[in-house]
Amino acid sequence: MAYLLVFVGGGLGAMFRHFINTLSGRLLGTAFPYHTFFINVTGSIVMGLIAGYLAFKGGSSQHFRLFLMTGILGGYTTFSAFSLDAALLYERGAVGLAVVYVLGSVVLAIAGLFGGMALIRAMT
């Protein structure tokens, strides 16, 4: 049952990620990997919100956590795409953009996680 929950959640997360990828490409262009940047930051914020809620409120089942955190968020976020995008920027000669992308993604994702946890902590 656990594998099925992760499988279904992962499919949903991947579908939403694909939606964000295509939408950002249409709206913002493809010169900078806005799609992966947005996905990594928002995924970390949501993970922080969920982790904070579960840590302070508890009460959710392992199946729920597997479906939501491992499945949906695991399918939605990815640092393998992050690494590829950074390498592609570098390979294209956009070294400055690559540095901004890597530093911005890491700093904002970690800040988003702490922010999500702090928000839940303040609400409980």
Curated annotation (Swiss-Prot):
It holds the Pfam family CRCB. This is Fluoride-specific ion channel FluC. One of its GO terms (biological process) is cellular detoxification of fluoride. It is a multi-pass membrane protein. It catalyses: fluoride(in) = fluoride(out). Na(+) binds at residues 74, 77. It is found in: Cell inner membrane. Fluoride-specific ion channel. Important for reducing fluoride concentration in the cell, thus reducing its toxicity. Signal peptide: none annotated. It comes from the Bacteria. Keywords: Cell inner membrane, Cell membrane, Ion channel, Ion transport, Membrane, Metal-binding, Sodium, Transmembrane, Transmembrane helix, Transport. The keyword Transmembrane applies. GO terms for cellular component: plasma membrane. Belongs to the fluoride channel Fluc/FEX (TC 1.A.43) family. The chain crosses the membrane at residues 1-21, 36-56, 66-86, 94-114. GO terms for molecular function: fluoride channel activity; metal ion binding. Na(+) is not transported, but it plays an essential structural role and its presence is essential for fluoride channel function.
